Design a protein with these regions (language model features):
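Hydrophobic alpha-helix feature that most strongly marks membrane-spanning transmembrane helices
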Residues: 252, 281, 285, 315, ...
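Conserved S-adenosyl-L-methionine
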Residues: 207-312, 317-321, 325-328, 333, ...
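Hydrophobic alpha-helical scaffolding
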Residues: 153, 182, 237, 265-269, ...
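Non-catalytic, mostly N-terminal accessory regions of nucleic-acid modification and defense proteins
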Residues: 1-229, 288-301, 394-397, 415, ...
């Protein structure tokens, strides 16, 4: 019997293998630290594989009649001695959006050292040198972008070698999906990288929310803002860059050229800034993340930028943002935000970045819709009176792993009802959507918005603003879900922007499939017991971590 052909790993298999690789490090590092070791190696594995894939294409192009011969000025086959030089021509790779990886920095060198077939230096030193070399040969990567801590001793050589050999089992070559369409290596690796970021964020809990926004929330922001080809997109609190990935997917899905979208981001945390660089590089997204990691309030890396689309999920209700140092900043056009809460500082910073007709979507704590402390009520009133607020969405609970604080979405539009193509005919009106009852539980502790629900929310907004699309129809208020409210009514309610105040109560209806009360109580009791179990597990993890540092 002929030997059975080795089955190529599928994306789901890759994700499972990657997560096992993280487990190999868990014994010595916590989630916040080990993600950088693992994701850095994933990046190194990917850039080497992507270059090999491109190298194979170049070799094909150098054969008789190949596409590359004429481009290089050859009438026939190139001299044999010239072929190796051509295949190492850096511009042939970087010009195609592929990182050039010098021979000494390639994955096979790292793998051979991990297997013990190469002598000193240490494996950690080999990896650090590879990262440094890749930065040096690719000008799109600023110095210090890639992690270079593998020789620090925080991970022993045996564990590191096991991780390298485990990652070597992955294949990042292009595949054919179930629908028969070719899925590129970059798309596959992008999926794996995003999945891994999500898993690390889950492990880190609250801290993970600093660099990761739930995909369904990102999707909703992008679907409602509708970025287009040729526009400039900014995220002043970009985390690992997930907003940009989804924005470019939206442009491409709607027939635009995703390469013709200018992307700008800023992130203050060095390690998260590195994660964003690697994440966006794997997705093939050219981005300007500034010269260095920096705080958007005090060291704006894009001072003169005017953007068409601004979106962000900044940290909720932060009090240590240094507001007392800014005073009467030019950005505070609607009022000076309170020193003890940055919510309205984030909004005004984003609005200050608007190009004519600019639009923004921002995730904030629910308190931003009704708080009057520190002058927030006056700032909110000024924004509404200036017809800046287009739509408010109250989100369901448990969407965010990192916080139990209820959240909402603000959608702002410059010139709404005047020259804005985004919301051209709704001057003096605000759309309120109450989505608190939507979503399904993906686990005992996490809720997600379904495709249908995302379509319902975004479609309602699109119909309200007069957009076009299949099945949109005319906008109508739906009791308990959405309502368009005039400026006069908002004045009567002192500019409170909580959707539940305006949309009313859904019409009572007898649902034959409704869950009986006894069954509901039983189910909720089981869910509560599950939460108790999860709490016990997390307490054990915390005690273990405290034991290591004590």
């Amino acid at each position: 019997m002929p030997p059975r052909k080795k089955k190529e790993a599928q994306p789901e298999d890759m994700k499972s293998i990657l997560w096992k690789s993280a487990d190999k490090l868990r014994g010595s590092l916590d989630a916040a630290e080990y993600k950088h070791f693992v994701l850095g190696l994933v990046f190194l594995k990917y850039v080497s594989a992507a270059m090999e894939e491109k190298r194979a294409q170049l070799e094909e192009g150098l054969r008789p009649g190949g596409w590359l011969l004429a481009d290089l000025g050859f009438d026939g086959e190139p001299p044999a001695a010239a072929v190796p030089q051509i295949l190492e021509d850096r511009e042939l790779y970087t010009g195609a959006g592929i990182f050039y990886v010098p021979p000494t920095a390639r994955w096979e060198v790292v793998l051979e050292r991990a297997k013990g077939t190469l002598d000193d230096p240490t494996l950690g030193k080999v990896i650090d040198t590879a990262m440094e070399t890749i930065e040096k040969f690719n000008t799109s990567l600023k110095k210090g972008t890639l992690p270079q801590q593998y020789n620090s001793g925080r991970v022993d050589e045996t564990t590191l070698a096991g991780l390298v050999k485990l990652l070597d089992r992955l294949t990042f070559q292009a595949q054919v999906g179930e629908d028969g369409q070719r899925v590129g290596a970059r798309d596959l690796m992008g999926e794996v990288y995003e999945y891994f970021l999500a898993q690390f964020a889950l492990q880190e809990g609250r801290k993970g929310g600093e660099y990761f926004t739930p995909p369904s929330v990102v999707r909703l922001l992008v679907e409602m803002l509708e970025p287009e080809e040729g526009e400039r997109v900014l995220d002043p609190a970009c985390g690992s860059g997930g907003m940009f990935v989804q924005a470019e997917k939206f442009v491409e899905t709607h027939g635009g050229d995703r390469m013709n979208v200018a992307v700008y981001g800023q992130e203050r945390n060095l390690t998260t800034w590195r994660l964003a660089h690697m994440n966006l590089a794997i997705h093939g997204i050219e981005v300007d993340l500034g010269e260095e990691p920096a705080d958007s309030f005090h060291n704006d890396q894009h001072g003169g930028l005017k953007a068409d689309v601004v979106l962000a999920n900044p940290p909720f209700n932060i009090s240590d943002w240094g507001g007392e140092q800014l005073g009467l900043d030019d950005r505070w056009a609607y009022g000076t935000p309170p020193v003890g809460n940055a919510n309205f500082a984030w909004m005004q910073h984003m609005v200050s970045k608007f190009a004519p007709g600019g639009r923004a979507g921002i995730v904030l704590a629910n308190g931003s819709m009704s708080s009057k402390s520190g002058g927030e009520g006056d700032i909110r009133r000024a924004m509404v009176e200036d017809d800046l607020v287009a739509c408010m969405v109250a989100l369901p609970g448990q969407l965010f792993r990192s916080t139990q604080i209820p959240a909402c979405l603000w959608f702002l539009g410059e010139g709404k009802g005047r020259h804005s193509k985004w919301v051209p005919g709704r001057k003096g009106e605000v759309l309120f959507i109450d989505a608190r009852e939507l979503g399904v539980m993906a686990s005992r502790t996490e809720r997600v918005l379904t495709e249908e629900e995302l379509g319902r929310i975004a479609g309602t907004f699109r119909a309200w603003r007069g957009g076009e699309g299949e099945g949109l129809g005319l906008y109508e208020d739906v009791p308990g879900f959405c309502r368009s409210v005039s400026l006069d009514e908002l004045r009567k309610h002192e500019f409170m922007l909580t959707p539940g105040r305006y949309v009313g109560v859904a019409e009572a209806a007898v649902d034959p499939d409704a869950e009986p009360v006894e069954e509901r109580v039983t189910r909720l009791a089981k869910e509560l017991l599950g939460l108790f179990e999860e709490s016990g597990r997390l307490e054990g993890v915390l005690r273990e971590q405290l034991g290591r540092v004590s």
